[in-house]
From Swiss-Prot:
GO terms for biological process: cell division; proteolysis involved in protein catabolic process. Keywords: ATP-binding, Chaperone, Metal-binding, Nucleotide-binding, Zinc. It comes from Chlamydia felis (strain Fe/C-56). InterPro entries: AAA+_ATPase, ATP-dep_Clp_protease_ClpX, ATPase_AAA_core, Clp_ATPase_C, Clp_protease_ATP-bd_su_ClpX, ClpX_bact, P-loop_NTPase, Znf_CppX_C4. This is ATP-dependent Clp protease ATP-binding subunit ClpX. It comes from the Bacteria. One of its GO terms (molecular function) is zinc ion binding. Belongs to the ClpX chaperone family.
């Protein structure tokens, strides 16, 4: 039979040679495989995972979506994120408006304002990712993180942008309705600017193609997501996910963006150094509060992409005091975690104040912000965590400033022999 004359299923594309039965209707055909698939969907209970991404289908299931106020959102973030007061307030308002909009849509109310996608500027380790993670936790919505540098447009080797939606769907246990109200955080977004140099020959060097591909899912589309990920191919099954109400938060360091802003403002009129490369960190942080859409476009982001983020806010570089606070104050502070680990061995772990500041100084020199704190403490305590479980004589360990700065051994306080027995 001529291949051109083969009859195919109008839904999956299988030909009559590949199926057992092909049932004809008015101008359409459906195969036995698709009939079984549809039958299985209809047999499912109404509370099971939806197979369509349409938000209107999910509305009856969640008529009373609870929305925290901006103050409540910030209060929860404060428990985990130190500093960044301006960023936390701005994001709290944006998130409140976003989920208020979703609640109105679920209750079939007319909504004239768009969703509040967020663009976070700031150096590595300033808390951008942690803010996004904390938001998802307190709002009890699915959350996933993607790295923009691994994404490619269609036709290039790399990760398809729609796989980000798949990861969110997986985080929602394949509950489409929940995924459609989740949060996606895309890190390193500045690395796909058109001016970014990239020597790879397997992807779009300019980054514009990746921005265009992301634009579609950020502005709102029905994504056909392969359940198992990977590239799309003919005759593949898809899960349809509507991205219109997914909150997108993107973050990046945007190195040298401050110079672009200073050039636009006129450096001599704002009191900065005559040398554009001689800004202090305080100067850079201040300049980033003045960022405009045109600055991001000059950096290399396309206008359409920037236009989808009506909330643009910067996270400032963390001070020494803030780094020390990160070590000790949050609910899940890393010092608290190590103290608990040693307490399970009946050992008291003590950090002197000077030692905490020494750790903060070391982290600041590493230029990776709060991210360096965990590595410094791991390297510091690794040998102790190896030895202590086998040594019942250890009662307490005192970490001093010279332990950090001069690599001197910590002070070990031992139990009296009679206390060991």
């Amino acid at each position: 039979m001529n291949k051109k004359n083969l009859t195919i299923c109008s839904f999956c594309g299988r030909s009559e040679k590949d199926v057992e039965k092909l049932i004809a209707g008015p101008s359409v055909y459906i195969c036995d495989y698709c009939i079984k698939l549809c039958s299985g969907i209809l047999d499912k209970k109404p509370t099971s995972t939806p197979t369509s991404g349409a938000s209107t289908e999910a509305a009856p299931q969640h008529p009373d979506l609870q929305v925290l106020t901006p103050k409540e959102i910030k209060k929860h973030i404060d428990q985990y994120v130190v500093g960044q007061e301006r960023a936390k307030k701005t994001i709290a308002v944006a998130v409140y408006n976003h989920y208020k909009r979703i609640r109105a849509l679920l209750n079939n109310k007319h909504v004239s304002y768009g969703k509040s996608n967020v663009l976070l500027l700031g150096p590595t380790g300033s808390g951008k990712t942690l803010i996004a993670k904390t938001l998802a936790k307190i709002l009890d919505v699915p959350f996933t993180i993607a790295d923009a540098t691994t994404l490619t447009e269609a036709g290039y080797v790399g990760e398809d942008v729609e796989n980000i939606v798949l990861r969110l769907l997986q985080a929602a246990d394949y509950d489409v309705a929940r995924a459609e109200r989740g949060i996606i955080y895309i890190d390193e977004i500045d690395k796909i600017g058109r001016t970014t140099a990239n020597v790879s020959i397997t992807r779009d060097v300019s980054g514009e193609g990746v921005q265009q591909a992301l634009l579609k899912i950020i502005e709102g589309t029905t994504a056909n997501v392969p359940p198992k990920g990977g590239r799309k191919h003919p005759n593949q099954e898809y899960i349809r996910v509507n991205t219109e109400n997914i909150l997108f938060i993107v973050g990046g360091a945007f190195v040298n963006l401050d110079k672009i802003i200073a050039k636009r403002l006129g450096k001599t009129t704002i009191g900065f150094s005559d040398d554009l490369g001689d800004f202090s960190q305080k100067d850079r942080d201040h300049l980033l509060t003045k960022v405009e859409t045109e600055d991001l476009i000059a950096f290399g982001m396309i206008p359409e992409f920037v236009g989808r983020f009506n909330c643009i806010v910067n996270c400032e570089e963390l001070s020494l005091d803030e780094l020390v606070a990160i070590l000790t104050e949050p609910t899940n502070a890393i010092i608290k975690q190590y103290i608990e680990l040693f307490s399970e061995e009946n050992v008291k772990l003590i950090f002197e104040k000077e030692a905490l500041y020494a750790i903060a100084k070391k982290a600041k020199l590493a230029k990776t912000g709060a991210r360096a704190l965990g590595m410094i403490l791991e390297n510091l305590l690794r040998d102790l965590m190896f030895e202590v479980p086998s040594d019942p004589t250890v009662e307490a360990i005192r970490i001093q400033e010279d332990t950090i700065l001069e690599n001197k051994a910590p002070v070990i306080i031992r139990r009296a022999p009679e206390a060991i027995a």
